[in-house]
Amino acid sequence: MINTSGNTLIIDIRDELSFEYGHIDGAVNIPAEKLDKSDLPKDKKLLICCKSGLISDTEAEKLRELGYDAENLEGGYYGWLREKLSKEVVEDISQDAERSIQKKFRKEIWNRFTQSVNEYELIKPNDRIAVCISGGKDSMLMAKLIQMLHRHSKFPFEVKYLVMDPGYSPANREIIERNAKRLGIPITVFESDIFDSVYNVEKNPCYLCARMRRGHLYSKAQELGCNKIALGHHYDDVIETILMSMLYGGQIQTMMPKLNSTNFKGMQLIRPLYMVREDDIKRWRDYNGLRFIQCACKFTDTCTTCAPDSRTVSKRMEIKQLIAKLKLVNPQVEYNIFKSVENVMLNQVIAYKDDEG
């Protein structure tokens, strides 16, 4: 039996990854495919929640047929989030957010950020960097960190804080703009039609969207005179990518801390959060009372990605769960995965590929 308090139990039926990214206070996570196998209380009102209220409407109806007092949360988690943020005063918390980075999270976030920048030589004198902000927790923190570094840097470099609107709903775009304003980040927004282009693509629309977004970001950054784009991938993204490449791709490769563009001459991609852990990013977010949208595309608005067979989400979730299980046996497993691609013994592999194939 699920532990509950009060007369209403909020059940979030999204996948675990989405739930961890952000959820309604007090909600419990039971993915949709496990809902009918769960021991739910019949003496409580069940409020069923998904991303946008479409999948949860069907699940609530199924529960009512089984005798439960179940209702759908209209608009889902994102509807709740938009309403909550719309009622809040847009308060500038930039100084508090910076103070928390400098003091409470100095070791976990600031030191690891600067270590990444220095060890991999991500930022050099006279660089012009386009900090690419999707509106999520990772890119917003990255923007704040680079803003702080820029203010106190011993050498000159320039920064543009770039947000691409690929077709957000007005409400979702407003959330991104409000969070940027709260954190004191002066964003430049430009528009594209990427969401319309990939919406009817049946196979791997998320992969295609990511590729197109990066191309648009490179192009806009170059137009603004920048020589680098900064993306918000973190340490956990790196180790998950290593395992996903091995287990699903049959190859050994990693997510590089910096990468020269093959299509945009003179442009380079950098990842300043390369050594920052996701759990620490979440702690910083929660400590400062910030809420972000994980993905604000049309698939989110129509609950397409609520489906339990969402391949990209399920694969990454499988890898996260695998790493968590391995960590119970070997606490160093995450570090070992990260370091494995730095310790490749070429004379002890059957074959390898270089840039020439």
What are these model-derived regions, one by one?
Residues 14, 231-235, 342:
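Short, well-ordered beta-to-alpha junction loops that form the rim of enzyme active sites
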Residues 29, 72, 161, 189-191, ...:
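A structural preference for short, hydrophobic beta-strand core positions in alpha/beta folds
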Residues 89-244, 248-252, 256, 279-280, ...:
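ATP-dependent adenylation/nucleotidyltransferase module used to activate substrates
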Residues 158-159, 229, 237-318, 322:
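Catalytic subdomain that performs nucleotidyl-dependent activation
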Residues 318-345:
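An accessory alpha-helical subdomain
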